[in-house]
Amino acid sequence: PSMGQMFSSDIKLGSVRDIESSVFVRQAQIGNADLKPAESTNTNFGLIYGNNGNRLSFDYWEIDFENRIEGQSAQALLSEDPFGPSITRNELGDLIGVTTTYFNEESTVLSGIDYGLSTVKSFFNGEVELILQGTNLIEFLTPEQSENGITMINRVGKHNFDAHTHSLPKNRINTFINYKKNKSKYSLIARYLDGYINNRTISSKALSLGYKNKVDSSLIFDISLELPISQYLQINNNSGDYDLKTSIGIINLFDEKAPRLYNAPDFSWDSRLHDPRGRMIRVN
């Protein structure tokens, strides 16, 4: 464990769903000096094939954790026991604070598949490169207390608002098309993210506003242009002894909105996965 996980102290405001309402409250996170080191058994099986500028890769992986260190979720603590020792209420019973810490999760099992494809072809006195990279998350098993004891729950494909983890879409795929010519580079990038389930109860008002229990998938396109300025500009009548480039890009080319997530009282988006800022231009 890190020094921060063992001895830190942090306070912020955050939203949680109480017994009958959603409120912003003080959320404190303190260190846990009794943390144990995490241990894991890793298993990998991979194949790589390459020929004449083509490359295909496949990698199955599994990680079996013991005592994985995780930060507690204020919402999960409140859902498990609304009047527990980590919950602070005033004399009227109103929620005013939740205190979280770090803990050792007894068992966690992760598995998935990483895959990739790349190829390079000559095109109009230049070179076209196609790259595809993806991850398929098969399982993310964590323990959950139930009436029948502790059971392992697969968190993949869920928002996981009620667990000590975060949203885990099943598939992520990125593709890149690059055209290179005379030290210039033109790129088109596509970023895909699977949709996932939000099991939080949605009010009738929120339903009327278009919120639902499925967070939509996301497909974002970016473009960029990289130019070698030093190829056209000389400094002190010298050339070839420096490399000067500029890069111009548009992120979220078609100005796609972030998928809506009902996470009362924040009618918002999933900040871990999506960016609500829309189209952006960058110059480097």
Predicted regions and their residues:
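Extracellular loop and loop/strand-boundary signature of outer-membrane beta-barrel proteins
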Residues: 30-33, 99-104, 157-164, 206-213, ...
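Extracytoplasmic gating/loop element in the C-terminal half of outer-membrane beta-barrel translocons
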Residues: 186-222
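Residues on the lipid-exposed face of transmembrane beta-strands in outer-membrane beta-barrel proteins
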Residues: 45-49, 115-119, 132, 175-179, ...
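Outer-membrane beta-barrel signature, preferentially recognizing the C-terminal barrel domain
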Residues: 1-57, 64, 90-113, 118-123, ...
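Gram-negative outer-membrane beta-barrel transporters
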Residues: 61-200
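C-terminal beta-signal and adjacent terminal beta-strands/loops
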Residues: 138, 190-203, 227-284
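Flexible, surface-exposed loop regions and adjacent strand-edge segments
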Residues: 7-14, 72-82, 146-155, 202-209, ...
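Short loop/turn motifs that connect adjacent beta-strands in outer-membrane beta-barrel proteins
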Residues: 52-55, 106, 122-130, 143-145, ...
